[in-house]
Amino acid sequence: MKILQNKQLVKQTLILWSAFLILACQTGETPSASVDSMSYLLPESSLNSIESHLDHAGIIEALDEESMKRGGRTYNYNCINCHGNMEVEGSIPLATKFWQDTLKVGTDPYSMYQTVTRGYGSMPPQMHLTPRERYDVIHYIRQNFIKEENPEEFSSVSRTYLSGLPKGDSLGPATKPYHPWSDMDYGNFFINTYELVDAETGPERYHSPGPSPFPDEDYSANNFAYKGIAVRLDPGKGGIAEGNAWMIFDHDLMRVAGGWTGEGFIDWDAILLNDRHETYPRTVGKLHFETPVGPAWANPATGSFKDPRFRARDGRQFGPLPKAWANYRGLYHHGDKIIISYAVGQSEILEYLSQEESDGQIVFTRELNISKASSRLKMRIAPAKYQVAMSGSGASLSQEAGFWILQGEDIAKANIKLFISEPGFAQIRSVAENAAPPQDLSVFTQGGPAHYPQEIESVVTVGNDDNAFAIDQLTPPFDNPWKCRMKLSGIDFFEDANLAAACATDGDIWLISGLTSPTNTLTWRRIG
């Protein structure tokens, strides 16, 4: 019986991994000079109904300089990542180099449209683009690369050619903004690398120009949180992207890197977000306060704030502080509250980031529950130019060497609330006096209601068991309440072969049941 269970588990593993590879991206080229309907990754039955009504000739005839500009933006925003250009190598060596390679499935616009729409070899279907956007980028590739640099592969468009294309009466839907990375409900926190900047006064984004290897940029004055936990502070639905006030906790250095307000959260520039390579997300909006890159808490053994971490050749320091100094434990997500847990020396700390408002002025708050320490703790809150106040007991507030300093007292514990605002906000002490007292944050570490109680069903397309290797295709729930993109990246199984857990590159985690069900129906529940 145990052997049968293990065989079933192995089969399910092969089925799931094969399905995920098929659904995520195809990584092998098909060595074929001709194309039939089975060579494309996406069958005709999976295409949108609009595809059968497209006026291909009408779209192609309308291509112009504006189409070239739009197509260039699409290519340099998306396609360049894999294909590269004449100066920069793409990330996939086998991806077609339009300026020198022989195209496997035709160079006329309609043949290229089939490749872009349905996928072929290592080229996944680009169904997120409208038909006109697909033809725009094809126009850019044909005119900019093939016609100019690879003329042997260029095929002209004639009246005879256009008359032979499939007939239709639609140009497809109008182009709409496409930003699924910011549409998704990630929840009220999001862990990433961030640069904190003010939209009006911050430094302009800079990358070294030219082909790789790029020379080092000078980021010595930039405020990066490499292990940043961004937390939404204002109430409301939609997760962190729908908020209008945030703070970032840097768990390398146990510092709050800053707080900002605005619309949009970040600019979403990152390979795992909007697919842009060699970049990082920046905050967007008004930066109300920030702290310099460096330890927030003094070394409990020496009282020094000197940063001991690895220094790279460009002068920046990376990595966490030594564990004896500070150690990030994790976080608790209770309702809409995010409780961050870490240790400084022998002292355990729970921290909750939030906000207060007074006469339209936002005040950023930090609640800290600090256990008794074996040595007196000292924390840099913010540079002295900002307004800072405190309520609660067990610590004192002062200024030292250009910073507001929180100094722990020799008592059993501290339970305090810090208030931080822009320079010149004189009412901050009044806000602190009238605000609710600091809470016992341990209450929010005991678990709470499920954040994602919904269950979603999808189907299994069963393969042929007569062959040596059977593949069943599992359909992820692309249509889900949180607009998760379902970019599945990992899977693990339970002892019960009917159950699996999968994670996605966007951070969502799913519990899957029904793997051995005869109904060929899967049930998905988001658990993180």
Q: Which residues are covered by each model-predicted region?
A:
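Flexible coil segments in periplasmic/lumen-exposed cytochrome c-class electron-transfer proteins
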Residues: A33, I50-G58, E65, N76, ...
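C-terminal motif of bacterial Sec signal peptides marking the signal peptidase cleavage site
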Residues: I22-A24
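Extended acidic/polar, glycine-enriched regions
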Residues: K385-Q387, G392-A450
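The canonical Cys-X-X-Cys-His
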Residues: G71-M86, V137-I141
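Beta-propeller domains
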Residues: E457-V462, L474-P476, N498-G528
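Beta-strand-rich N-terminal accessory domains
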Residues: S155-Y352, E356-T365, A382
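Gly/Gly-Pro-rich "capping" loops immediately C-terminal to redox-active cysteine motifs
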Residues: E65, G72, G84-Q114
